[in-house]
Amino acid sequence: MATMAHANTSHPLYVAGMAGNTNHMSPWGEDAHKRWLAALGPSSLRGPFAWQTCPQQRHPHQPDVSGPPGSGFGEQPSQDTPNPMFGATGPHQQHNFPSHPYAAHNSKEAHEAWLKVYQSVWGNTKHAGAWSGPWSPAAGGRQHHMSGGGGGGGPRWMGGPMPWTQCDETKKSFTPDIDVVETPESYSVQASLPGAKKEDVKVSWDPSTYELRIEGVVSRSVGNDEEGEKKTEQSGRFSLRERQTGKFCRTVYLGSQVDGDKIEEGGLSAGMDDGVLRIAVPRQGSGKGVKEITIV
């Protein structure tokens, strides 16, 4: 069995390979894709969403999947057949902009639909994966995925924290880099925001989606970013301009291990020091292990 590459996706093809054996993978071929399509329903997402396995000339980040005949894995389709993972529409088109929700930047809704499918099959979403949207233009596309922003950038990619990012698609928007540190008591989210003032940064928690949202603006010098640039340019020309300024946002999915009761009691805290925003999110105690039940 070939090693699964970047298995932190929520698409059934990848979830199928998590167990590492073809027997487990077999039921998750085309049937799982049809279930996913049925749950997705009418959508503004770009298609086509056709089910195909990996072609022989696959993308570098497309996994090498093998399986028995009829399982939906390892069966080489024609290269003229649309590939849902990378939107290929003709020979050697694996590098087209992704049209499949695995990669499309606007497919958080698709991930939510996939969670419903997973829930209906397994009865829970513990190992369904978290959406990280690595191909979002605001997230830096494939480079962001390769550098860790979506490819394992969070602790315990199966059922644990995994970042998902989305920002305004403007030339002044940027996505701050983050670290997520997991301890028995909390998740420590650390965002790199050099030049940001704490009054210009907003942190919010959505208990319905287990998401922590960080947003705000970083100004160059005076006033807002646009005004600051104009005033600076009046007094001199930029010979080099590399700092990331303007509006930013980052959403971090932390999962159901977060302790909602402690958050409601004011247990979520945030502080900024030396250009780093640090947020402590309480998590449920790790001492709650499996409890044996006596049959009477």
Swiss-Prot record:
Disulfide linkage: none
InterPro entries xref list: A-crystallin/Hsp20_dom, HSP20-like_chaperone, Small_HSP
PANTHER family referenced in this protein's UniProt entry, alphabetically: HEAT-SHOCK PROTEIN 20 FAMILY MEMBER
Alphabetical UniProt keywords: Stress response
UniProt cross-references to PROSITE patterns, sorted A to Z: SHSP
Organism domain of life: Eukaryota
Protein name, entry field: SHSP domain-containing protein CPUR_05420
Protein family membership: Belongs to the small heat shock protein (HSP20) family.
Positions of the sHSP domain: 169-296
Ranges for region Disordered: 50-83
Function: Monooxygenase; part of the ergochrome gene cluster responsible for the typical purple-black color of the ergot sclerotia. The ergochrome gene cluster produces several ergot pigments including the yellow ergochrome secalonic acid and its derivatives, as well as the red anthraquinones endocrocin and clavorubin. The pathway begins with the synthesis of atrochrysone thioester by the polyketide synthase (PKS) CPUR_05437. The atrochrysone carboxyl ACP thioesterase CPUR_05436 then breaks the thioester bond and releases the atrochrysone carboxylic acid from CPUR_05437.
